[in-house]
């Protein structure tokens, strides 16, 4: 047993309705007991089980909320679509290339470049409170480039999803059935 009492939580959002009868499960002046990396107990500090922990961490009065879950990400890509976003915000027609612009940049990028960018995005997500990410391919659009994207994604994520038909690639613009057969 390696349990730690975490106290100094001004507000805990537990998502456990047993705490306050709401879906949020808000507890004021709260504490957690963590067993290795899993929550063993949560509730009001005054109700914390005694002698159930070996160490104590005092957070100094912060709020604690569950980690965010991002259920739709593409971590492996190259390029930048800010010009497309700007055009849309200005009410211009969508002619910026969109996904296909990103596909071209991703195909041209090295594995090392794609991996560095994916690692950076994972770090930024974690620092912003996202603790669970589902990531998918979708910016290769050839069998080889999709497999390359999935291999890179597996280096930064436990679960990855194949999205080979994000859009039809330019080289299959008029041959949709052939592309579906390829994928």
Task: Name the predicted role of every residue range.
Residues 9, 32, 37, 61, ...:
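Divalent metal-coordination and catalytic microenvironments
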Residues 8-9, 36, 59-60, 117, ...:
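Fold-independent oxyanion-binding glycine-rich loops
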Residues 48, 59-117:
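Metal-associated gating/positioning segment near the N- to mid-region
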Residues 100-117, 133-183:
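Metal-coordinating catalytic core of metallo-dependent amide/deamination hydrolases
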């Amino acid at each position: 047993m390696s349990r730690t009492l975490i106290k100094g939580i001004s507000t805990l959002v537990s998502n456990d309705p047993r705490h306050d009868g709401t879906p949020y499960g808000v507890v004021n002046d709260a504490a957690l007991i963590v067993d290795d990396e899993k929550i063993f107990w949560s509730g009001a500090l005054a109700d914390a089980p005694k002698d159930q922990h070996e160490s104590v961490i005092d957070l100094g009065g912060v709020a604690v909320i569950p980690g965010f879950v991002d259920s739709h990400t593409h971590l492996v890509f190259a390029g930048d679509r800010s010009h497309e976003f700007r055009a849309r915000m200005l009410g211009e027609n969508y002619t910026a290339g969109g996904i296909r612009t990103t596909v071209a940049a991703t195909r041209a990028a090295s594995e090392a470049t794609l991996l560095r960018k994916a690692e950076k995005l994972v770090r930024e997500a974690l620092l912003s409170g996202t603790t669970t990410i589902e990531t998918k391919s979708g910016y290769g659009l050839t069998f080889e480039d999709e497999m390359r994207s999935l291999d890179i994604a597996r280096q930064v994520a436990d679960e990855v999803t194949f999205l080979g038909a994000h859009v039809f690639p330019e080289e299959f613009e008029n041959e949709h059935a052939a592309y579906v057969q390829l994928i």
